Amino acid sequence: MPLYEFTFIAQQGLTQYELEGLVKGLSSLLTKNGAELLKYEYWGLLDFAYTIDKMNKGHYCMIYIKATPSSMDEFKRKVRLNEDILRFLCLKKDKLPKGDSLMIQASQV
């Protein structure tokens, strides 16, 4: 199964508890379609370069997913219907990176 990097921005009004619930919901949606969540990173509540839906900040998150292309298409379709997710980007990757992403490393400096 191919590997995907799925980065999304959630609404700024979500609490940490609600954000964890959102990620658990995404994870269960993936497992229902035969996919697997491999890694999750929370990058923080960051400012936007421009206003999105009258919001200036959002929770940035990234997950790595192993899924078939058809199950990934179904996952993206359902994510588009979720009002808590403002934007997302899905990229196909060759391999799972080792260690933390650059966003996590930059926040630790």
UniProtKB/Swiss-Prot annotation:
Domain of life assignment: Bacteria
InterPro entries linked: Ribosomal_bS6 (IPR000529), Ribosomal_bS6_sf (IPR035980), Ribosomal_S6_plastid/chlpt (IPR020814), Transl_elong_EF1B/ribsomal_bS6 (IPR014717)
Keyword set includes Ribosomal protein: yes
One matching Pfam family: Ribosomal_S6
Keywords per UniProt: Ribonucleoprotein, Ribosomal protein, RNA-binding, rRNA-binding
GO molecular function: small ribosomal subunit rRNA binding; structural constituent of ribosome
GO cellular component term of the entry, any: ribosome
GO biological-process terms attached to the record: translation
Task of the protein: Binds together with bS18 to 16S ribosomal RNA.
Family, as annotated: Belongs to the bacterial ribosomal protein bS6 family.
Entry protein name: Small ribosomal subunit protein bS6
Gene source species: Ehrlichia chaffeensis (strain ATCC CRL-10679 / Arkansas)
Gene that specifies this protein: rpsF
